[in-house]
């Protein structure tokens, strides 16, 4: 999922767009078009080191695919899963109202920051770009974090404000 695609469905690109963006995937797909990487591959990936994964990406000419300096809440665990990505651009009241109207039209509930969470399934990893915003932007706390974990059994990668760290560690 790529967030803020206003022309398609509020904050979700269409199945057709997602398939067009991932033409090399020949395996099974979720109903929304996302590639459904087999659980057996996800299990094997838990054994791959960061250096091994990075070497494969470099050899396939995937450049600029690594960003370090993340805060790790559970350093003894390995985070592997199917990525569901969202981008939240800095807020503008005029655009926010329009996107909210799309949510009403699409019968979405709650606020915009919960919409991508509604798409999550077991073994997903929620990957969010909030541009590092710590003021006036969505945050992940223990309520949303627990909702994400209940749906996925997994953690998150989040470039934005995190609160309730102790609740998230539990």
What function would you assign to each model-found segment?
Residues 1, 23-27, 115-118:
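Short hydrophobic/aromatic-rich motifs at helix boundaries and adjacent loops
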Residues 3, 34, 145:
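Short, flexible, solvent-exposed loop/turn segments with mixed acidic/basic and small polar residues
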Residues 10-11, 15-17, 22-24, 43, ...:
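Mixed-charge, polar/low-complexity N-terminal
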Residues 11-60:
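N-terminal pre-domain segments of enzymes
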Residues 50, 57-170:
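Feature captures the catalytic cores and cofactor-binding loops of soluble hydro-lyases/lyases
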């Amino acid at each position: 999922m790529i967030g803020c695609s206003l022309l398609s469905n509020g904050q979700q690109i269409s199945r057709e767009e997602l398939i067009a963006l991932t033409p090399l995937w020949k395996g099974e797909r979720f109903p929304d078009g996302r590639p459904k990487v087999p659980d057996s591959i996800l299990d094997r990936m838990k054994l791959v080191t960061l250096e091994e994964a990075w070497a494969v990406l470099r050899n396939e000419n995937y450049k600029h695919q690594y960003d370090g300096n993340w805060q790790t809440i559970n350093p003894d665990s390995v985070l592997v899963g199917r990525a569901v990505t969202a981008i939240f651009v800095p807020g503008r009241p005029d655009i926010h109202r329009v996107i909210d109207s799309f949510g009403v039209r699409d019968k979405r509930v709650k606020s915009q920051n919960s919409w991508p969470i509604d798409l999550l399934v077991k073994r997903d990893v929620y990957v969010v770009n909030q541009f590092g915003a710590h003021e006036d932007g969505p945050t992940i706390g223990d309520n949303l974090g627990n909702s994400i974990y209940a749906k996925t059994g997994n953690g998150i990668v989040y470039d934005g404000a995190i609160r309730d760290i102790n609740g998230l560690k539990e």
